[in-house]
Amino acid sequence: MGKKKSLLKTSLFTVGLLEVVNRIIDSASIANTNTKTGGSYYHWKHGDIYYRTFGEKDYPPMLLIHDLTVWSSEYEWLKMAKVLSDTYRIYCVDLIGCGKSDKPGITYTNYFYVQMITDFVKEVIKAPTLVAATGLSGSFVLMANALDETLFTEIMLVSPESLTTLKKSPDEYSKLWLKLFEIPVIGRSVYYFSVLPAFPFRV
């Protein structure tokens, strides 16, 4: 009985400590977002989407989409965007759940991002656009194009995921991880630790 009480106290203390750390990081990240925008927000139905533009408005549009990892953002494209802005009107976007865009507490799916990209092109760019996407985001672009061929004039994929990876379906093990990550204290802690450069576990 004594061991159980000790284990319970230790568990509660650990959870409480994680929550304190999470709140400190939350405050710092909110302050950073509020003071270092330098871009615009598209008020989408599922959350605000941060993006930056480069180049003249009358140049042909080009949409640059970053990879989908916990540390990804439009910053990945910054140097290239400045070079391309000599001939294109560049749109660098933070996908929902990444960078300075909103991070709603939902299960993110491929089709969710397909909808986001489709609406962004139609409501922000407002013209068929050349698009370049890295990693997993290439699959969102291809699906969006399959559903609406008027969105893009050209598609460029940088280091796209293999078809072997893309065809995988969630198994019971991954569903169990999802349930664990959906617990707010644990999910946020794993996210914050996984974005640290020296942290060995990537999600």
Regions found by a protein language model. Give the residues of each.
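Active-site loop/oxyanion-hole signature of alpha/beta-hydrolase fold enzymes
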Residues: 78, 82, 92-132
